[in-house]
Amino acid sequence: MDLEAKVKKMGLGHEQGFGAPCLKCKEKCEGFELHFWRKICRNCKCGQEEHDVLLSNEEDRKVGKLFEDTKYTTLIAKLKTDGIPMYKRNVMILTNPVAAKKNVSINTVTYEWAPPVQNQALARQYMQMLPKEKQPVAGSEGAQYRKKQLAKQLPAHDQDPSKCHELSPKEVKEMEQFVKKYKSEALGVGDVKLPREMDTQGPNRMLLPGGDRSTTAAVGAMEGKSAEPKRTQYSCYCCKLSMKEGDPAIYAERAGYDKLWHPACFVCSACQELLVDMIYFWKNGKLYCGRHYCDSEKPRCAGCDELIFSNEYTQAENQNWHLKHFCCFDCDNILAGEIYVMVNDKPVCKPCYVKNHAVVCQGCHNAIDPEVQRVTYNNFSWHASTECFLCSCCSKCLIGQKFMPVEGMVFCSVECKKMMS
């Protein structure tokens, strides 16, 4: 790809969603403008998923690429125009049966995603077993939740080198090998089934949670009498409660036939969020979303949110950083060898801290330097000096002394307080 094409591609990526309002900051944000490398809005610092950006086609491309070259190619279709794999998510439209019987206008409910099962009643049951605020009904809180989780759990930059910032040829190759490996060893999509279906699909003797085994025939069959197969009593692998016979359960092929989950229990073991569209990663007996599976395999840069494939990176404040991305969160100046202050888990250089975040001294009304000692009471602060932390009436120094706070003022005694009231 020549330089002009690269620049054009980069420009298109930064134009997507430009100006979209932030659903979190409301009018405080001037509109979405993608930071050059941080994956956040330059105006409000929120992620793209927090903005009212229409991402359905982009998300379908992302998931389609995830399923490319896997056993889940039945879930994708390639566009004739450019050959890009697109996710064929199952959209379900349900008709309100009560309204239909009463001969009135029929109400319909559209789910932006539903499990791809032939039995629509089973899909309906599955949806009803999810928390209402997480059911992906079009235009609802649940649809917004699904959109956020698609962005959070399956970042495009965890699978596509072209979505990353300035990878070297060696890093691109390492990332491609990493993606190929997790597709073949960890990636899976859950299946919605009734527990009784598992007895006909699993091995003749299956391990139950806890290690017990169940046989497939009753004792009477040993005497030549016909008998119904004995049904396995399944428990949810997550909550350990029993599975009800007629309720849908989720089966994860990579986990094995002996494990089932309640729909609301099919969650990432790290973030405890519902696994979006039942897309999971299996590792060491645990379910993960894509993000947290990758985090368990590779360090992630706290600056750009990308996985680190370079041997050289830095660690600070219990986080990992590309060398070029350990920067001030406000001005993007590199912080190597500089004084910085952590603000909401983000490093900020000293000048930006004083300008944007420092508390103001109630005594001198100047910003308090991060390296200077201070006295704080409730929401008020003072320089811990003989010039600032003084009685608001008689100017007695209060360092190491008892004091009486009153609405941003401090007094050395009841008498001084009365004189100022």
Swiss-Prot record:
One of its GO terms (cellular component) is focal adhesion. It is found in: Cytoplasm; Cell junction, Focal adhesion. The keyword ATP-binding does not apply. SMART domains: LIM. Residues 133-164 are annotated as: Disordered. Residues 155-164 have a biased composition (Basic and acidic residues). GO terms for biological process: negative regulation of cell population proliferation. Interacts via LIM domain 1 with ZYX. Interacts (via LIM domain 3) with ENAH and VASP. Interacts with ALKBH4, talin, actin, alpha-actinin, GRIP1 and PXN. Interacts (via LIM domain 2) with ACTL7A (via N-terminus). Heterodimer with ACTL7A; the heterodimer interacts with ENAH to form a heterotrimer. Residues 234-297, 299-359, 362-421 form the LIM zinc-binding domain. Residues 92-199 form the PET domain. Its main location: cytoplasm. InterPro entries: LIM1_Testin (IPR034958), LIM2_Testin (IPR034959), LIM3_Testin (IPR034960), PET_domain (IPR010442), PET_testin (IPR033724), Pk/Esn/Tes (IPR047120), Znf_LIM (IPR001781). The N-terminal and the C-terminal halves of the protein can associate with each other, thereby hindering interactions with ZYX. Scaffold protein that may play a role in cell adhesion, cell spreading and in the reorganization of the actin cytoskeleton. Plays a role in the regulation of cell proliferation. May act as a tumor suppressor. It comes from the Eukaryota. Keywords: Cell junction, Cytoplasm, LIM domain, Metal-binding, Repeat, Zinc. This is Testin. One of its GO terms (molecular function) is zinc ion binding.
